Amino acid sequence: MLGEVNRLISSRGLDAMTTAAVVAYYREENVAKVSYAGHPPVLYRRAAEKAWSFAKPQGRKGLNNGPPMNIPLSVEPDTPYGQLTIPMTIGDQLFVYTDGIIDAPSPGGEPFGLARLKDALDANEGASLSDLKSAVLETLNHYTEKELSHDDVTLIALEIC
């Protein structure tokens, strides 16, 4: 799907790019399938575990080492986008977010980053999805010492039922 969207956007001749993540859950197979186009990695937490893990996309491998993956949309018209498969069971959770979260700067200019995001999620084990999102935003606002306004900030938290 991302390949087709990429070709469509690229054909418009716009001097712009964007990121995207597609997450689909297949109940019959008990898996989530994730594809990235320049997007930060989804986090997942198994119901039986306390810590969150990154569903890491493959980086750009180069011309002779296979197809590029996780390239933003509209950068290369014929980019083949890969897909990660995450086995899921009841109670497992997924956390999808935009780069506005990890790029949010401290007053000194240091980005919030992936490690702080994971730490914020890990620190709120057992929280409802709504409380989990609120805790991440509260941690982020405390880190930046202000309400976020520099970039888009979107959080999606899902639990397999």
Question: Where are the regions a protein language model picked out?
Answer:
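Conserved subregion of the PPM/PP2C metallophosphatase catalytic domain
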Residues: 1-161
